[in-house]
Regions:
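Donor-binding and catalytic core of enzymes assembling or modifying cell-surface/extracellular glycoconjugates
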Residues: 1-79
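N-terminal low-hydrophobic presequence detector
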Residues: 5, 145-146
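Nucleotide-sugar donor-binding patch of glycosyltransferase catalytic domains
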Residues: 29, 35, 67-145
Length: 146
């Protein structure tokens, strides 16, 4: 909501009933947010990604897809870590949001359950940290274009 209030356009990518319901609740709270239609072809989704200033993504497929079209990614890492070698192609390590805890990585491919039952890797990442990372990326890219 903070980014929406600052006037940033927010596009939500996802597919599936559960994700769609979450995205619907997010756009209800954020006037500048909209859902990228899942009816777009793969090529159309890549073309749309190529227009973004930044992609915010978990260490997942969208991180890698945005990387392929040269879009900087604010990547959020939980049970995995960029040190495992899965950072997006040509992405800056500074854009990765990772807690660097002693228990990381607990998995090289992600996990839905925390072996230590605390999920500190995710619960310790504040929304403010993510927002600051996004704004830093946008500012840096605007300066590069100028």
């Amino acid at each position: 909501n903070n980014l929406s209030q600052k006037g940033y356009a927010i596009y939500l990518f996802g597919n599936g009933a559960h994700e769609y319901n979450i995205m619907q609740s997010l756009i209800a709270e954020s006037p500048n947010a909209s859902i990228v239609p899942d009816k777009l072809s793969f090529q159309e989704q890549l073309e749309f990604m190529a227009t973004l200033d930044v992609m915010v993504s978990m260490d997942s497929a969208n991180m890698h897809l945005a990387s392929l079209v040269n879009i900087p990614v604010a990547s959020i890492w939980g049970g995995t870590t960029p040190l495992c070698g899965f950072l997006g192609w040509q992405q800056s390590k500074e854009n990765a949001i990772c807690m660097d805890l002693p228990c990381q990585p607990c998995s090289i491919s992600g996990t839905a359950e925390c072996p230590l039952h605390h999920f500190s890797c995710m619960n310790s990442i504040s929304p403010d940290r993510v927002i600051q990372n996004i704004e830093n990326i946008i500012t840096l890219n605007k300066n590069k274009r100028s």
